[in-house]
Amino acid sequence: MALSTFKREHIKKNLRNDEYDLVIIGGGITGAGIALDASERGMKVALVEMQDFAQGTSSRSTKLVHGGLRYLKQFQIGVVAETGKERAIVYENGPHVTTPEWMLLPMHKGGTFGKFSTSIGLGMYDRLAGVKKSERKKMLSKKETLAKEPLVKKEGLKGGGYYVEYRTDDARLTIEVMKRAAEKGAEIINYTKSEHFTYDKNQQVNGVKVIDKLTNENYTIKAKKVVNAAGPWVDDVRSGDYARNNKKLRLTKGVHVVIDQSKFPLGQAVYFDTEKDGRMIFAIPREGKAYVGTTDTFYDNIKSSPLTTQEDRDYLIDAINYMFPSVNVTDEDIESTWAGIRPLIYEEGKDPSEISRKDEIWEGKSGLLTIAGGKLTGYRHMAQDIVDLVSKRLKKDYGLTFSPCNTKGLAISGGDVGGSKNFDAFVEQKVDVAKGFGIDEDVARRLASKYGSNVDELFNIAQTSQYHDSKLPLEIYVELVYSIQQEMVYKPNDFLVRRSGKMYFNIKDVLDYKDAVIDIMADMLDYSPAQIEAYTEEVEQAIKEAQHGNNQPAVKE
């Protein structure tokens, strides 16, 4: 129970009393990766997140561990090579949260991709990214392309490219990395905001003053080194330090829409260019839905709640109807949406899609280290780079020595399944185990596929007598209880949006079972009447935002 909600007070006591080699500000995928790398090397690590884990950018992506095909168009050869290699590592270390997905790249007359350039480009991509033989590109005829996805626009179709991306659950990837870090000894807590830095007599950062957002308690965490990994908030965190460079972020917003497959019966993931501006977007089938995105526009508004506007929805609807003309999707067909912010490093005069997705490490005179930019796929390598630097500084300043990076072959929580090649056999073995507990085969398969080697804990929860009084289907009940016991879920939205993903991919379950979820959480976590009221309102607001978005301007007035 290393990341249990029931251990919050114990974790807070340790954070107050101990000194840490490294304190990390930010509980997205970047912070989680740093916590795992540093704790695996033997550092004493603490991490604070002001919201829930992955509540910012790390739950709002296209949910792909990209191989970096788009960077080939910009001739960023090194980025393609590194991204491809990292993608393979992410998959191998957690096949329960990342899975290969064949992607269709239709080629139309006058479109971005011609047959020759696509074949050359995908071939280069295979070589640079070290793609394994079974997943290397295929070039398809018009007939073969339509056989893969009959909904694709036939007019002007010349054929298609066929290559592999890796689909992931970004929020679950983050929490599984975080759980492994906690197992390695990292003290990790959410809903805890860094307010100020503390300094020693040489004006070097030696701690962080924080506030528990659930109880309004203030305390100080002592640290030898502090890393700012706050994603879109890195500039806000740095503003509390006296020593800053002239670097800054440029935020852009990306939006996705979700449509039921009864309306948009997409059977194949497709990567295609839009009619309006030639931007490449994805349409991906998942759990009986099709999701489509993303947009790319500058953003300067409330970072904690970027929303989908009507303009965003219209852009994606037009894109769907252009590439899949027979489906005739309308705004009413959109079940759910999400919007996320990309924390890109400012480059003057560049359009959103032109700004590099590279990451950088900034070191202030105060000793504060900031990691900015970057991509979901590169989280492990980003962590390695900055923890290497932390290790050097700790050796120089304190004479401490730590082992080198060891995360390349380190399974994340739930990833102890015997490697990606054994994963399907592992799932079937767990389905057989579940039969002995009387758990439905489909439910068992979904749970084993989602939770990997942690699934036995969910099967055990299914045997408890409390389930029968819960008014929840077994699958939702065991996921909810597990997320409280093992994944530091405190608020209903932590579960409904991020741990389960239901707010995006099964909003009907949210509407049907939200009250029962709140009842169980209120009982297990001893909510006050005021908390029940506040958290119920938060759920209703999240539903409203997912279903309708609003006309929030990109730039606040």
Swiss-Prot record:
One Pfam family, short name: DAO_C
Keywords carried by this UniProt record: Cytoplasm, FAD, Flavoprotein, Glycerol metabolism, Oxidoreductase
Compartment(s) of residence: Cytoplasm
GO biological process: glycerol catabolic process; glycerol-3-phosphate catabolic process
Gene Ontology MF term list: glycerol-3-phosphate dehydrogenase (quinone) activity
Binding, FAD: 21-49
Stated family: Belongs to the FAD-dependent glycerol-3-phosphate dehydrogenase family.
Name of this chain's protein: Aerobic glycerol-3-phosphate dehydrogenase
